[in-house]
């Protein structure tokens, strides 16, 4: 049985990715899209459109208002919010990280956090889902199993992440112009300044019972898409045990793959809903855990479709497997292993 799905914000990078994925989905039918025209938002019309699910690729501060109105007007529909408006546990924490009051505080705590692999038990039947941030996804997928099993210290975790430029959105900014990005590489919002830190720490506390304070440093790569994150952790066990724990956590996952050998590369994951993880020994009592994903797919639109599938009771992989004709993890890993021998 098919379902009608509407997309708010289809003119942004994430919104366009949603539309592309939905057009290939075997059970979802694209009912309508809204976008913006020369900076003027044109989303109001979507509130009057009947659909079984609504995907909100809107800026934070705006998305919560639409989520609230959709929940009130169409309570049986699934609403997946891809902004940061519903990710944090309190209105106070939202104001701290986003710098303004929440537009729909009554929704806080109602949404299921959409880190699909970690919240699979809560997503079936959910009617309000908060999609994680792209950086948060790259950090949480490796850390949740390791902290939950008490295999690493909860203090002194450093997350060093590099993202393609689409992670900054389509807003016209001088620092995102080609001549500013090309042949350059820069860090921004270092330490505890990036708003994704708040959701990372909140989810780690909720899913693992541990209070973690991350040092997080994001960087902007001169590429279109992809995130490569290096997590520097202090293990309580050897690296082989860390790897086994991650393999056990994701052995039945369609999209999260623990790989041996060289760390994952952006080319392994761009265009897919995959996240690839590898574990390596470090010096001075540390280990390094790498994760790689596509910020627009597993970090945004693909995970939103995955959450929609779970909420609707559809196969989790609908519309996502080989959606871009990308090689499978086995093919890519085998090819690289052959080239390195």
Regions found by a protein language model. Give the residues of each.
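Alpha-helical scaffold segments in soluble metabolic enzymes
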Residues: 17, 141-145, 199-203, 245, ...
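C-terminal active-site/capping subdomain that shapes the small-molecule cofactor and substrate pocket
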Residues: 229-341
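Short amphipathic beta-strand starts and helix->beta connectors
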Residues: 38-41, 209-219, 272-276
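C-terminal substrate-binding/catalytic lobe of Rossmann-fold NAD(P)-dependent dehydrogenases
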Residues: 192-260
């Amino acid at each position: 049985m098919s379902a009608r799905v509407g997309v708010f914000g289809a003119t942004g990078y994430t919104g366009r990715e949603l539309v592309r994925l939905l057009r290939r989905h075997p059970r979802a039918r694209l009912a309508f899209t809204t976008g913006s025209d020369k900076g003027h938002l044109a989303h109001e019309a979507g509130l009057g459109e009947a659909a079984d699910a609504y995907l909100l690729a809107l800026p934070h501060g705006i998305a919560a208002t639409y989520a609230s109105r959709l929940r009130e007007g169409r309570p049986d529909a699934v609403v997946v919010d891809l902004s940061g408006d519903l990710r944090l546990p309190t209105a106070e924490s939202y104001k701290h990280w986003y710098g303004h009051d929440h537009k729909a505080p009554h929704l806080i705590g109602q949404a299921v956090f959409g880190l699909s692999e970690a919240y699979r038990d809560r997503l079936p039947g959910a009617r309000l889902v908060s999609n994680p941030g792209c950086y948060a996804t790259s950090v949480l997928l490796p850390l949740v199993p390791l902290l939950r099993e008490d295999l690493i210290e909860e203090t002194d975790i450093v997350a060093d992440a590099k993202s393609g430029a689409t992670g900054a959105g389509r807003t016209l900014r001088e620092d995102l112009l080609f001549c500013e990005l090309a042949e350059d590489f820069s860090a921004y919002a270092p330490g505890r300044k990036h708003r994704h830190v708040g959701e990372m720490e909140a989810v780690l506390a909720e899913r693992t019972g541990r209070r973690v304070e991350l040092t997080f440093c994001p960087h902007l790569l001169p590429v279109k898409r992809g995130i490569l994150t290096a997590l520097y952790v202090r293990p309580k066990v050897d690296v082989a045990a860390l790897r086994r724990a991650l393999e056990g956590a994701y052995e039945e996952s369609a999209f999260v793959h623990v790989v041996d050998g060289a760390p994952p590369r952006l080319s392994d994951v761009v265009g897919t809903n995959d996240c690839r993880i590898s574990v390596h020994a470090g010096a001075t009592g540390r280990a390094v855990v790498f994760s790689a994903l596509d910020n627009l797919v597993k970090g945004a639109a693909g995970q939103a479709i995955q959450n929609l599938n779970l909420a609707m009771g559809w196969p989790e992989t609908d519309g996502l497997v080989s959606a871009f004709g990308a090689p499978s993890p086995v093919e890519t890993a085998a090819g690289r292993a052959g080239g390195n021998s």
